[in-house]
């Protein structure tokens, strides 16, 4: 199972943690976006959208991290796997959190920070307010349950952990979010693949400081 990735990418790290939780060995293929390796013809044949992470499982190629995470559990997980249980209501809640991470939490972080370290633009206070709003939503979610989508660890936790650990390593102030901190301190060192996730965060920090 070939896995095209960059360690500093939070979406890539969420897939790595999912694979670790399932006991799946990934054949990791480093793809250096900064050198344009994702635009080479051989990779475009695999993924015409030229994004990472990309997974190739016995000739079947797919991308988008959260879709990959769900695929891995559905194909290789246990029946009614706690990471993504078969109950429609439980799955719906996990899906909501996954889409929240993609479309609100991570997006607001990227919208705020990427112009600063990619284009050397000043911080935009309005974009920071949107990021804070996303953190407040997450804090509310985590005030209602032990984990991101209920009382057991699910794919939602692994996706959001990849995001929040990135916020941590670039020194975003999370101190006023009591429930995020409780959850993060519980998982940051104990989640499957936590060490590799943090190593990728440290790579991200180097890039952020450039």
Swiss-Prot record:
Disulfide bonds: none annotated. Residues 1-80 form the GST N-terminal domain. PROSITE patterns: GST_CTER, GST_NTER. GO terms for biological process: glutathione metabolic process. It comes from the Eukaryota. Its EC number is 2.5.1.18. It catalyses: RX + glutathione = an S-substituted glutathione + a halide anion + H(+). Gene3D superfamilies: 1.20.1050.10, Glutaredoxin. It holds the Pfam family GST_C. Keywords: Transferase. CDD domains: GST_C_Delta_Epsilon, GST_N_Delta_Epsilon. Glutathione binds at residues 9, 50-52, 64-66. Conjugation of reduced glutathione to a wide number of exogenous and endogenous hydrophobic electrophiles. This is Glutathione S-transferase 2. It comes from Musca domestica. The gene is Gst2.
């Amino acid at each position: 199972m070939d896995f095209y990735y960059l360690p500093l990418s939070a979406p890539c790290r969420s897939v790595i943690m999912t694979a670790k939780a399932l006991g799946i060995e990934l054949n990791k293929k480093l793809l250096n976006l900064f050198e344009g390796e994702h635009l080479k013809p051989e990779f475009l044949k695999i993924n015409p959208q030229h994004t990472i992470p990309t997974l190739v499982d016995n000739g079947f190629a797919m991308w988008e991290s959260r879709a990959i995470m769900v695929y891995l559990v559905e194909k290789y997980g246990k029946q009614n796997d706690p990471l993504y249980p078969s109950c429609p209501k439980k799955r719906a809640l996990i899906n909501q959190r996954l889409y929240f991470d993609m479309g609100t939490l991570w997006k607001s972080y990227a919208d705020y920070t990427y112009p600063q370290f990619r284009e050397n633009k000043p911080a935009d206070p309005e974009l920071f307010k949107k990021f804070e709003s996303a953190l407040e939503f997450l804090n509310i979610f985590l005030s209602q349950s032990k984990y991101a989508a209920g009382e057991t660890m699910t794919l939602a936790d692994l996706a959001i952990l990849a995001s929040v650990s990135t916020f941590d390593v670039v020194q975003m102030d999370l101190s006023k979010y009591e429930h995020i901190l409780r959850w993060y301190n519980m998982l940051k060192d104990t989640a499957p693949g936590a060490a590799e996730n943090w190593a990728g965060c440290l790579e991200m920090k180097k890039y952020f400081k450039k």
